Regions:
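Anionic, Ser/Thr-rich low-complexity intrinsically disordered regions
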Residues: 56-64, 71, 75-81, 90-115, ...
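ATP-dependent NMP and nucleoside kinases share a basic, alpha-helical "lid"
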Residues: 24, 28-90
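C-terminal accessory "lid"/substrate-recognition subdomains
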Residues: 34, 97, 106-121, 142-156
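Short, flexible turn/loop "capping" segments at secondary-structure junctions
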Residues: 11-15, 61-63, 117-121
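Conserved hydrophobic residues forming the short capping helix/wall of the S-adenosyl-L-methionine
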Residues: 87, 137, 145, 149
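Phosphate-binding beta-loop-alpha motif at adenosine-nucleotide cofactor sites
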Residues: 67-69, 120-135
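ATP-dependent small-molecule kinase phosphotransfer cores
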Residues: 1-49, 98-114, 125, 134, ...
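Short, glycine- and charge-enriched coil/turn segments that flank and shape catalytic ligand pockets
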Residues: 47-49, 88-97, 151-154
């Protein structure tokens, strides 16, 4: 199986997530970035015969015609606790209250921005993982994928 996995922890830093939210408000930058993402999708789909994307608007803006879309959600306080624990492991100097405030602010900004506001993609399967850990969430998503696209069962 040939694949590329990209999991750069810097992409999830507070600095990057705040910048991403700010950049998403600018329609010219937003249009340019979405076009780059869509071009990458076409190239990678041809090379690997499929692609899995992750992001706040992948299913609604970047790849709205995807075969299968998920909308992962969790309670704000649960998300803040998870992010705070991640930062503690990385020895970041930040409080839970700061993380909670940052997430709350980003949610409001992303849901209320003029261009491409954050929303549940049309046709997406909603998975609320407030009560599930990472492994449980992966298993839930995999089971849904296999039930909707059985031919993938032996490929993932």
């Amino acid at each position: 199986k040939e694949y590329i996995a990209h999991n750069n922890k810097k992409l999830y830093s507070t600095k990057v997530t705040k910048l991403a939210s700010k950049l998403a408000k600018n329609i010219e930058i937003r249009t340019f970035i979405v076009k780059i993402q869509q071009d990458m999708i076409i190239t990678l789909e041809k090379k690997f015969n499929g692609i899995i994307l992750e992001g706040r608007d992948c299913g609604s803006v970047v790849a709205p015609k995807a075969d299968l879309k998920f909308y992962l959600t969790a309670n704000l306080k649960v998300r803040a606790e998870r992010r705070f624990n991640q930062f503690v492991k990385e020895k970041k100097d930040i409080t839970y209250e700061q993380v909670l405030g940052d997430l709350r602010e980003r949610d409001v900004q992303d849901k209320n921005r003029e261009h491409s506001p954050l929303q549940k993609p049309k046709g997406a399967v909603v998975v609320d993982n407030s009560d599930y850990n990472f492994e449980e969430t992966i298993n839930i998503v995999k089971n849904i994928i296999f039930s909707k696209i059985p031919t993938l069962k032996n490929k993932i």
